Design a protein with these regions (language model features):
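Primarily the internal scaffold of c-type cytochrome electron-transfer domains
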Residues: 218, 226, 340-348, 423-460, ...
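Hydrophobic or amphipathic alpha-helical targeting/insertion segments
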Residues: 400-404
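His/Cys-centered metal/cofactor-coordination and adjacent catalytic loops
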Residues: 81, 140, 196, 437-448, ...
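Extracellular/lumenal glycan-associated surfaces
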Residues: 93-95, 102, 198-200
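Sequence/structural segment immediately N-terminal to covalent heme-attachment motifs in c-type
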Residues: 56-81, 149-187, 307-328, 333-342, ...
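Axial heme c-ligation environment in periplasmic c-type cytochrome domains
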Residues: 83-90, 105-152, 189-195, 212-246, ...
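Intrinsic disorder/low-complexity detector
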Residues: 57-60, 136-166, 250-287, 298-300, ...
């Protein structure tokens, strides 16, 4: 009797498998869709915990947006997922404007998550919008409820309370229903209201807590902050338990508002926020707004063609000097200052350069500005902190100083006060600054080298003066002064835990053996056949050098190529007989195959203009491993530039890999494919992990 039953069961199982495969093939018909799905699944679920599950074989490289944004899907996955430090919500199918705003808020510091801020820092508004549209358009199957009701631990009374608040609100406490803004099915309303289903209770609790405490901010009027502050702890627990236990029914119906919003709730919204978008747009029976179709544009004060010639020249010089890098904090008013700059001696705050008469340069003259730039003195004669690089700007000509001042005077005045510096005694005292200047500063002007070409001298003027390259690419002493005069011998950037490699060493970042065109390409786009930029240099390329005209880029390249060769601060060391990496470091080889080979290749050859080669890469074999560890831990994108507007991203592995994992994979890379550099220890990784990246 057992055999016939077993045989029949086998036939039924085979029939079920056949039917399931046919259904799946029909659902995923088309090679392109299958490839995208598999790529998302492998990428997303292959890098989450410790040494992650093995990938089988690297897929062929395809230049798609899905490939470019692997830095996103590696953490978020196709469905959202729990991570070691948080819950990463599903991105697929969310309203495009909502996703775009969140990306902007992370990049500009309005939402606080350092990994996201660092990852998005080099990207433009336009690219963020394109990324948002990409994920919004994905129609992937929804996962089961994050926490089914039967396993949530919530009582029936709690779930009923959560359902009532979500669907009806509480007019007596001026609490609108969640459906009033988030749609009848609570799956979002186009163009900018997210869904609330398919999320974990921890994530929902964290977001409501962020709204309550002011850690998460919205554009005025901030309706979510108002709602969150009216919810008690029991309300939050009930709502999160009920929402997280609900199944998502589909995207198609999600972009519609609730069929009927209670009149008293509409009255609450209208009374508390008369201009609140959700109070107006969620009226009963009203259709959803259309999804966005056009990308935003970066905001600038004026087009250069509409400026007076002197002002236009000043705007160009401000970009050459990357003034916005300090004087325009992320998400703040252009050149209005107020941002903190960390130094080994405390915080200094960038000043307001707009013509505001109280907080800015409104009462300054061009002579006052020249005094600050050339002599390091404020309008009232006070000595300025050398965190403002007047030690470089003293080389700027009076004509260029006047042009810069004309540009800053043309800006709209912004009444943004500059906080007082927070320096440890005695570093902010005037007598201490006088002593420092006596040792390390002498006002001067750029003196052209008579034995060099005009092009070389123009490059030297830009690199040594406005570009203030040695502010990063030179070592500093215990008092913060750059060492070696104008030499660009490399050094650790204070408080940023990035190493600016020597521009005078062919083993570090020297370009004496490069073609001029390749140097120009690196400064213009962040990419060249030999290298790509990352970290602070990515921000310099995005905010400064990509905007320089061809003649100035050529001049800088000529000067940099001609720099005298000198020993690097991080002396390049070589192992004469490295052990075979796969035999001596199986852990590193395994992690590389699982996490890195898909993009960088089994032999470390990379993909041109997408993923840098690791074989023979000087950044890999530097004795200072700071940058390499930072890159593995924090990931990142190359800078988005006019010539490379959609750069490829690398996912952060700070949460996915332990210190020993990171040390093992970096050691493998530094000892493979002809690379011969020292091992990296877990202690080195741990020390870098605990430092501030940006």
């Amino acid at each position: 009797m057992q055999r016939p039953i077993a045989a029949r069961g086998a036939r039924l199982t085979a029939a079920f498998r056949h039917a399931w495969r046919r259904a799946l093939a029909w659902l995923l018909r088309g090679a392109a869709l299958v490839a995208v799905w598999e790529a998302l699944w492998v990428i997303a679920w292959g890098a989450t915990s410790g040494v992650v599950g093995a990938q089988t074989k690297a897929a062929p490289f395809e230049d798609t947006l899905a490939q470019r944004v692997q830095a996103c899907t590696t953490c978020h996955g196709p469905q959202g997922r729990a991570g070691p430090d948080a819950y990463y919500p599903r991105l697929a199918g969310k309203p495009a404007h909502y996703l775009y705003k969140q990306l902007m808020d992370f990049r500009d510091g309005r939402r606080h998550y350092p990994l996201m801020t660092g990852l998005l820092a080099p990207l433009t508004d336009e690219y963020l919008f394109e990324i948002a549209q990409h994920f919004s358009a994905l129609d992937l199957p929804h996962a089961p409820p994050a926490v089914p009701a039967r396993r949530s631990g919530a009582t029936a009374q709690q779930l009923a309370r959560g359902q009532r608040l979500a669907k009806e609100g509480d007019a007596s406490r001026q609490l609108p229903a969640c459906t009033a803004c988030h749609g009848a099915l609570l799956t979002g309303v186009a163009p900018d209201v997210p869904g609330l289903l398919g999320l974990s209770p921890d994530y929902i609790n964290a977001q409501l807590g962020g709204w309550r405490l002011g850690l998460r901010l919205g554009a005025a009027p901030d309706c979510m902050a108002l709602v969150a502050k009216r919810l008690g702890p029991d309300d939050v627990a009930a709502v999160s338990a009920w929402l997280s236990s609900q199944r998502v029914l589909g995207i198609e119906a999600s972009m519609k508002p609730a069929p009927g919003v209670a009149p008293e709730v509409s009255a609450i919204l209208a009374r508390d926020h008369a201009d609140l978008a959700c109070a107006k747009a969620r009226a009963p029976g009203q259709g959803a707004a259309a999804a966005p179709t056009e990308a935003p544009t970066e905001i600038s004060s004026k087009e250069p063609s509409k400026m007076l010639p002197l002002v236009a020249r000043g705007a160009y010089l401000a970009q050459a000097g990357h003034c916005a890098g300090c004087h325009t904090p992320r998400g703040a008013e252009p050149y209005a200052g107020g941002g903190a700059i960390d130094t080994p001696f405390g915080k200094v705050y960038a000043s307001n350069l707009t013509p505001d008469t109280i907080h800015g340069l409104g009462n300054w003259t061009r002579d006052d500005f020249w005094q600050a730039l050339h002599h390091g003195r404020s309008k009232n004669g006070r000595l300025l902190s050398p965190a403002f690089p007047y030690t470089n700007y003293t080389l700027v000509s009076r004509e260029d100083s006047d042009a810069l001042f004309a540009f800053f005077q043309s800006l709209p005045p912004k009444p943004v006060p500059t906080p007082a510096h927070e320096l440890r005694w005695p570093f902010g005292a005037q007598w201490a600054l006088r002593a420092w200047r006596a040792l390390y500063f002498k006002p001067g002007t750029y003196e052209a080298a008579t034995n060099k070409s005009a092009e070389w001298n123009r490059g030297a003027y830009l690199v040594q003066g406005l570009g203030h390259c040695n502010a990063c690419h030179a070592p500093r002493n215990a008092l913060g002064a750059s060492q070696g005069g104008g030499a660009l011998a490399g050094g650790l950037i204070p408080m940023q835990n990035w190493f600016a490699p020597a521009l005078t060493s062919v083993h570090d970042a020297g370009v004496s053996r490069w073609a001029i065109g390749d140097i120009v390409a690196l400064l213009k786009t962040g990419l060249s056949p030999q290298a790509s930029v990352s970290g602070p240099m990515a921000e310099v390329v995005r905010g400064s050098t990509q905007h320089l005209n061809p003649a100035d880029l050529q001049a800088m390249a000529v000067y940099l190529k001609d720099l005298p060769t000198a020993p690097s601060l991080a002396t390049h060391t070589v192992q004469t007989a490295p052990t075979a990496p796969s035999a001596s470091n199986p852990q590193g080889a395994k992690i590389y195959k699982q996490q890195c080979a898909q993009c960088h290749g089994e032999q470390g050859l990379g993909v041109a203009r997408a993923y840098p080669a690791l074989a023979g890469n000087r950044a890999v074999t530097l004795t200072s491993t700071v940058n390499l560890v930072q890159t593995v831990l924090h990931g990142g994108f190359a800078p988005a530039t006019g010539a490379n507007p959609r750069p490829f991203g690398m996912p952060p592995y700070q949460l996915a890999l332990s210190d020993s994992d990171v040390a093992a994979v970096i050691t493998h890379i530094r000892g493979s494919w002809g690379n011969q550099a020292s091992r990296v220890t877990a202690l080195e990784v741990s020390q870098n992990r605990n430092q501030t990246m940006r």
